[in-house]
Structures are given as C-alpha cells and as structure tokens.
Amino acid sequence: MFSLLKYSVKINVNLDNGVYVFDNESATGKSRLYSLVKKYSAYGEPVAGYTFEDFCRGLDITAVLNPKKFALVVLDRLDMYSNRSILSLIEKSAHDCIILVDCKNDFQVNIDYDWCYINMTANAIEVS
C-alpha cells in the first residue's frame, strides 16, 4: 500500500509490494500517473518513473529500481526496452517496493506479476 495525499492530485495504490501490469487500454490515466510520479519525485517523494525516453538518453534504470530509496516505481513502455538484466533487477526490487508496469503491447515475460487496474478522477488516481 502506498499513498500520496498532500497534493492537489492524490495517488493511492492499494497493492502490496510486487510487480503489477496495467492492461494496454488507452486513456485510462497511466500516462498521467507517470507524469505525476516524475513530478512528485522532484519534490523529494519516495516515487520514481522510467520510460523509453530515459532508456534512449542512456539513463541507468538501476537509479529508479532502488527499493531503499523508492516505495513506488512506474515503468512506462517497458516492452520497448526490457531485457533479461532489467527483468532480473525488477524481480529483485519487487520484494521491497511496488512496481507498476505499462506496456504498449502484451507483457509476455517470465517473471511473477499480477494485473492492476487504474481509476482516474480530476483530483485522484487510484490503482488496485
């Protein structure tokens, strides 16, 4: 479970530590969640986000898959940059933080994960 309730758009994640994958339906709030996580991370909150653009810029994903530093990690478009090394790191980190995964295509990898669902309103995003 993780919540950030002090900002104008609240984030509430009703999940235990582990890897959770969103379905690939468009316009549900996943991109907004990613944007808010990046914004709140800049405010010093224990959240992080990583996307294909970060990968292309050469940013090291190990900086965000750090459960000692982050309670919630959002991995956007993971299917575009995942490899065995990244998936292994995700598996290790998932014991100590919540990792939410968005893919543009079906998520077909050999790691343990569950599905998650997002509900967005004007003032809140809830993931369960």
Give the positions of each predicted feature.
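Phosphate-binding P-loop
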Residues: 12-17
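Post-Walker A helix-loop "phosphate-sensing" segment adjacent to the P-loop in P-loop NTPases
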Residues: 39-50
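N-terminal pre-Walker A segment at the start of P-loop NTPase domains
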Residues: 1-11
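Walker A (P-loop) phosphate-binding loop of P-loop NTPases
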Residues: 26-30
